[in-house]
From Swiss-Prot:
Keyword Transmembrane helix: no
Keyword Phosphoprotein: yes
Basic and acidic residues compositional bias, start-end: 1-16, 501-525
Signal peptide (residue range): none
Annotated ranges, domain PCI: 286-465
Biological processes, Gene Ontology terms: proteasome-mediated ubiquitin-dependent protein catabolic process; regulation of protein catabolic process; ubiquitin-dependent protein catabolic process
Region described as Disordered: spans on this chain: 1-69, 500-534
Organism: Homo sapiens
Record-level GO cellular component terms: cytosol; extracellular exosome; extracellular region; ficolin-1-rich granule lumen; membrane; nucleoplasm; nucleus; proteasome accessory complex
Glycyl lysine isopeptide (Lys-Gly) (interchain with G-Cter in SUMO2) cross-link, chain position(s): 38
Name of the protein in question: 26S proteasome non-ATPase regulatory subunit 3
Similarity remark: Belongs to the proteasome subunit S3 family.
Subunit organization: Component of the 19S proteasome regulatory particle complex. The 26S proteasome consists of a 20S core particle (CP) and two 19S regulatory subunits (RP). The regulatory particle is made of a lid composed of 9 subunits including PSMD3, a base containing 6 ATPases and few additional components. Interacts with UBQLN1 (via ubiquitin-like domain). Interacts with ERCC6.
Length: 534
């Protein structure tokens, strides 16, 4: 009993709080206080989220303003390059400014163009008043940059025609990118009137770009036939002035114009009556070779068409212009099939071409196996795509090639086969059709066989050793010609320093400056104008 009493007292002592205010855990807060704290936290989180959103918007706006400032400075630098080209009569500085045009055009907006037009057109109020209504006036704030590229005496001097054309071209490109084609047409028409009255060699390169975008505007408006006479007039002027860049651009625009309306005869006459300038850049050469390849393919000159399109791929930029290379490959595959050759499987596996060339891969399989049913199936499935690519007319011609391939496969498989079985395998209407097709294949040299008209069968002849014919010689000749063409084109594309560089008439400082400029120019030319393809 004593032990039980002492145990109860010890338990009671443990339950009592320690005397003297010792450490003790505080009781948990009541539930309503917890709920109120959560609501306060939620309210505070909402206000924090709004503040974060405002901060992010302000940061994005600040970043955009910085990008606009950089774009304005780039435009200012390009204008300096144009002025330097005019004063020093060096067209390479114009090329340097135009080479950055695709990069600059992607960063254009109303704020940049409004500031540029107001900043540069200080003396020419007529052009400024004409361009500003097409642009939205930005809301000026304290953070906005005061863009004043022309101050003092320069503000009162008129702009150079090259600079004025370049700035107006930027507005045209922005309107095009914004899909405001009607407004772009008005600005471009005004720009063409100004360029047509000028006769300055430094303006030729800028004018060539203006011609290109002028035709693009009319193409988007589906009015290419309206601009054709203007392009012809400018081509005559460019030819008389020996403007190589203008000639190349205008010739390509006219060929594109004719091919858009399927005027192949007029396009062929233009090619035969004109000479494409050798000094044109690689991109214009690539376009010209592609257009001539299309003309040759329609006119049944398949060997010449394959040669020109192969050269077009060689002239095209290596890492960009994917759309252009896809278009050329589509036409080249069809032309090779029409020549009786099977394209290399490797080109169908390239990542940039694999998806777009899938219908042509199925078409190639049908032609290779001589399967007429599969050929008709591919034609029904992808007919609209072939029409959009402009290859449908040529693909229709492939039906005879499919039949020829089927006849050749049958001839290799059977030493003797009836005409009725051939008609059944090729899905022809009657044995008479099979007889006609086999006779034509024998005449064209597709197969070595004879037809027994009385008994209605085809007797294949023994295979001739191909090495006893001229086939190997022709194949080697084709390969050697290809290598020689590459060598000749590489030599023509090389750039040699002028003889004046051999004269030791410059100081060491001038030599260093010149070498630095040459190094920069070489780096820019190495890019080969990759961004010029739209």
């Amino acid at each position: 009993m004593k032990q039980e009493g002492s145990a109860r007292r010890r338990g009671a002592d443990k339950a009592k709080p320690p005397p003297g205010g010792g450490e003790q855990e505080p009781p948990p807060p009541p539930a309503p206080q917890d709920v109120e704290m959560k609501e306060e936290a939620a309210t505070g989180g909402g206000s924090t989220g709004e503040a974060d959103g405002k901060t992010a918007a302000a940061a994005a706006e600040h970043s955009q303003r910085e990008l606009d400032t950089v774009t304005l400075e780039d435009i200012k630098e390009h204008v300096k390059q144009l002025e330097k080209a005019v004063s020093g009569k060096e067209p390479r500085f114009v090329l340097r400014a135009l080479r950055m045009l695709p990069s600059t055009s992607r960063r254009l907006n109303h704020y940049v163009l409004y500031k540029a037009v107001q900043g540069f057109f200080t003396s020419n109020n007529a052009t400024r008043d004409f361009l500003l209504p097409f642009l939205e006036e930005p809301m000026d704030t304290e953070a906005d940059l005061q863009f004043r590229p022309r101050t003092g005496k320069a503000a009162s001097t008129p702009l150079l025609p090259e600079v004025e054309a370049y700035l107006q071209l930027l507005v045209v490109i922005f309107m095009m990118n914004s899909k405001r084609y009607k407004e772009a047409q008005k600005i471009s028409d005004d720009l063409m009137q100004k360029i047509s009255t000028q006769n300055r060699r430094a303006l030729d390169l800028v004018a060539a770009k203006c011609y290109y975008y002028h035709a693009r505007v009319y193409e988007f408006l589906d009015k290419l036939d309206v601009v054709r006479s203007f392009l012809h007039a400018r081509l005559r002027t460019a030819t008389l002035r020996h403007d190589a860049d203008g000639q190349a651009t205008l010739l390509n625009l006219l060929l594109r114009n004719y091919l858009h309306y399927s005027l192949y005869d007029q396009a062929e006459k233009l090619v035969s009556k004109s000479v494409f300038p050798e000094q044109a850049n690689n991109n214009e050469w690539a376009r010209y070779l592609y257009y001539t390849g299309r003309i040759k393919a329609i006119q049944l000159e398949y060997s010449e068409a394959r040669r020109t399109m192969t050269n077009a791929l060689r002239k095209a930029p290596q890492h960009t212009a994917v759309g252009f290379k896809q278009t050329v490959h589509k036409l080249l595959i069809v032309v090779e099939l029409l020549l009786g050759e099977i394209p290399d499987r490797l080109q169908f596996r390239q990542p940039s071409l694999k998806r777009s060339l899938m219908p042509y891969f199925l078409l190639t399989q049908a032609v290779r196996t001589g399967n007429l049913a599969k050929f008709n199936q591919v034609l029904d499935q992808f007919g609209e795509k072939f029409q959009a690519d402009g290859t449908y007319t040529l693909i229709i011609r492939l039906r005879h090639n499919v039949i020829k391939t089927g006849v050749r496969m049958i001839s290799l498989s059977y030493s003797r086969i009836s005409l009725a079985d051939i008609a059944q395998k090729l899905q022809l209407d009657s044995p008479e059709d099979a007889e006609f097709i086999v006779a034509k294949a024998i005449r064209d040299g597709v197969i070595e066989a004879s037809i027994n008209h009385e008994k209605g069968y085809v007797q294949s002849k023994e295979m001739i050793d191909i090495y006893s014919t001229r086939e190997p010689q022709l194949a080697f000749h084709q390969r050697i010609s290809f290598c020689l063409d590459i060598h000749n084109m590489s030599v023509k594309a090389m750039r040699f320093p002028p003889k004046s560089y051999n004269k030791d008439l410059e100081s060491a400082e001038e030599r260093r400056e010149r070498e630095q400029q040459d190094l920069e120019f070489a780096k820019e030319m190495a890019e080969d104008d990759d961004d010029s393809f739209p």
